[in-house]
Regions:
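Conserved ABC transporter NBD signature motif
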Residues: 64-76
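P-loop NTP-binding/switch modules centered on Walker-like glycine-rich loops
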Residues: 57, 178-182, 186, 190-269
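Conserved ABC ATPase "signature" region
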Residues: 75-76, 128-147, 256-257
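Conserved ABC ATPase signature
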Residues: 151-156, 160
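A short, proline-enriched helix->beta-strand linker immediately N-terminal to the Walker B motif
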Residues: 171-175
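Charged, flexible cofactor/metal-binding loops and thiol motifs
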Residues: 239-333
Length: 333
C-alpha cells in the first residue's frame, strides 16, 4: 500500500460573478502521506475551505474546478462521476465540517444517520451496523453510547455533536480525513480534547489528515507539515518546525508576529498586525498577490507571476522573488 494518501497538482477554482471571474483558488499543489497531518492555514477568505470542498468534489454548482492530478492512495479519482465519488466520500475519504449542527440532519437520530452511512458502504445487517456505530461512539469518548444513538442532534452539546461527526467519518476507516475548522465553534477546553482525539485516532487508523484552520495555536499542536495560503495561492509550505522557527515568506512572517508569545510579549504592548487589504481576485491578476501589503515590494514584484521556490531544501518552499539572504536581512532590520 502506498504511503502517499493524497496527491494534488495544479488545483484551481473559478467562480463566475456578474462582475467577472473570481479566481478563488489558483495553482494549488498538495500531498499527504499516511499518518501525516497537513495543516492549511490562512486568513478567512484565502481559499482554504474551497480547496477542501474541491478535493471532495462538493463545490457549489457555479464553481468551476480544474485540476491536473488528483490521486487517492496512488489511484486517480480525477474525472469520477457523482455516483463514483459518492462511493469514495465517507468510505475512502471523509470530511469533518466546522459546525456539526448544520452537517447532521435534525430530523433523524444519531443512530439512523450512522447506520445509513454503514449500510451505504458496507455489506452489513442493521443490527451489525448499529453495534459498530455504538462501538465507534465509545471510541471517540462518548458515554452512554446506546442512549446517544436514539437522540437527535439538538439534544447534544456542541462538543458531543463534533465527536459524533468524527465517529461518523471514521465508521468506514477512511484513508484520508479532511477537517475544515473542526474546533472553531468550540470553547478552548473542548477544542483541546477534540484535537487530542483526532491525533489519537489518526495514529490508531494510520490515516492521512488535512486540517483547515486559521488558528496557529492549533497548527502548533497537531501539524506535521504546514501550507500557508494567501489570496487563493499557497505562499509557503514546509514542516511545522520550519514554518514556526524559520518562516520565509513575508506573509508567513507577518502571521507569526501576530501571535502573542508568553514570556516575550510585554503586557500592554500592541499586538502585531498586517497592514492593508487582500487584493480583489476578480479578473486577471499579475504579480505577487501580497505586494500591496509587503515591506519589501519592488516594481518587479508587480510585473510577473511568482512561482514556489525551494532553494534551501525539498521540504520548504516559498512564493517570493527575494532570496533567503535578503529576507533574512529584512527580518533583522
Amino acid at each position: 500500500m502506498s504511503d502517499r494518501v493524497l496527491d494534488v497538482e495544479n488545483l484551481t477554482v473559478d467562480i463566475p460573478l456578474a462582475t467577472g471571474i473570481l479566481h478563488a483558488v489558483d495553482g494549488v499543489n498538495l500531498h499527504v502521506d499516511r499518518g501525516e497531518t497537513l495543516c492549511i492555514v490562512g486568513e478567512s477568505g484565502c481559499g482554504k475551505s474551497l480547496t477542501s470542498l474541491a478535493l471532495m468534489d462538493l463545490l457549489p454548482t457555479k464553481a468551476i474546478r480544474k485540476i491536473e492530478k488528483l490521486e487517492l492512495s496512488g489511484a486517480s479519482i480525477l474525472g469520477y462521476s457523482e455516483r463514483e465519488m459518492s462511493d469514495v466520500r465517507g468510505n475512502k475519504m471523509g470530511m469533518i465540517f466546522q459546525e456539526p449542527m448544520t452537517s447532521l440532519n435534525p430530523a433523524f437520530t444519531i443512530g439512523n444517520q450512522m447506520i445509513e452511512t454503514l449500510l451505504r458502504h458496507r455489506n452489513l445487517s442493521n443490527d451489525a451496523a448499529r453495534d459498530l456505530a455504538k462501538l465507534m461512539l465509545e471510541k471517540v469518548g462518548i458515554t452512554a453510547a446506546e442512549q446517544r444513538l436514539g437522540q437527535y442532534p439538538h439534544q447534544l452539546s456542541g462538543g458531543l455533536r463534533q465527536r459524533v461527526m468524527i465517529a461518523m467519518t471514521l465508521l468506514c476507516e477512511p484513508e484520508l480525513i479532511i477537517a475544515d475548522e473542526p474546533t472553531t465553534a468550540l470553547d478552548v477546553t473542548i477544542q483541546a480534547q477534540i484535537l487530542l482525539l483526532l491525533k489519537e485516532l489518526q495514529n490508531e487508523f494510520d490515516m492521512g489528515l488535512v486540517l483547515i484552520t486559521h488558528d496557529l495555536g492549533v497548527v502548533a499542536r497537531i501539524a506535521t507539515r504546514v501550507a500557508v495560503m494567501y489570496a487563493g495561492q499557497i505562499v509557503e509550505q514546509g514542516t511545522a518546525k520550519q514554518i514556526f522557527e524559520n518562516p520565509l515568506h513575508p506573509y508567513t512572517r507577518g502571521l507569526m508576529r501576530c501571535i502573542p508569545v508568553p514570556g516575550k510579549t510585554k503586557r500592554g504592548a500592541p499586538l502585531g498586525s498586517i497592514p492593508g487589504m487582500v487584493p480583489s481576485l476578480i479578473g486577471d491578476f499579475t504579480g505577487c498577490r501580497f505586494a500591496d501589503r509587503c515591506e519589501l515590494t519592488s516594481d518587479v514584484c508587480r510585473q510577473s507571476d511568482v512561482s514556489l521556490r525551494d532553494p534551501n531544501s525539498k521540504t520548504q518552499a516559498y512564493r517570493c522573488i527575494h532570496s533567503i539572504e535578503m529576507l533574512a536581512k529584512a527580518e533583522v532590520a
